[in-house]
Amino acid sequence: MKFLVVGAGGVGGYIGGRLSEKGNDVTFLVRQKRAEQLKKTGLVIHSEKGNVSFQPELISAGETGQFDVVIIASKAYSLGQVIEDVKPFIHQESVIIPFLNGYRHYEQLFAAFSKEQVLGGLCFIESALDNKGEIHHTSASHRFVFGEWNGERTERIRALEEAFSGVKAEVIISGHIEKDIWKKYLFIAAQAGITTLFQRPLGPILATEAGRHTAQTLIGEICTVLRKEGVPADPALEEESFRTMTSMSYHMKSSMLRDMENGQTTEGDHLHGFLIEKAKRLSLAAPVLETVYANLQMYEAEK
């Protein structure tokens, strides 16, 4: 089984590195600058779960080759170009596993490929590149979840399970992947929304009554949109999402807030813009969500 990992950053570099560490056939599709960096230093992972350092197999857009599994771990705003880049590497039986936040990317992938080729996927990990291009895994979690949309343990799922077996990461085959995706989407959109709106970590926000109320209102607005879309986002899910938020570190910053602090492009359109589009189409009022998105739009316009 030949793997193509699109992106060698905090997520793609990590899971691709773990697959390679086990002895799987893994190639990374990267841009020229990242390729030059990797050729010079190798792919390096610093993690309490075990460090990794090796010279990875690399390929660039425009080259030829066929791969059985394509793992997409790029930023959502790059997906249009990623789709064009990977098309030549995909054969009829290839399977695509995206590890992106949100849901909009599935609509793009289903339109570009057959839905049967795209598995549902998500991950829970805090990892990022330093200025030398080395990956630092800084969370206890390094969980990667994927599965068939109908929950079946198909032949290809069993083959993937074998390939991931023994990898130094928590890999879960889900029988309800769509539910898992929406659950994470709710939490990520709320966490990123509230921290970017107030430009603070979670702790100081949730330490105030007004901050807690705003966070709960945002979660409620997102759940209302999801319910109207047919997603089972009941009050128990709202409570669980807020409870998870309150259990996190006082100094916890969303990755989107860190992107803003570093002057980088955010996934605001992909996460919050997508929800706003649905709210408008459904004639739903979502004032906090709209304020979150307006703040992100102003940031993108000014950076």
Curated annotation (Swiss-Prot):
The keyword Isomerase does not apply. Keywords: NADP, Oxidoreductase. NADP(+) binds at residues 7-12, 101, 267. One of its GO terms (biological process) is pantothenate biosynthetic process. GO terms for molecular function: 2-dehydropantoate 2-reductase activity. SUPFAM superfamilies: 6-phosphogluconate dehydrogenase C-terminal domain-like, NAD(P)-binding Rossmann-fold domains. GO terms for cellular component: cytoplasm. Belongs to the ketopantoate reductase family. This is Uncharacterized oxidoreductase YkpB. It comes from Bacillus subtilis (strain 168). The gene is ykpB.
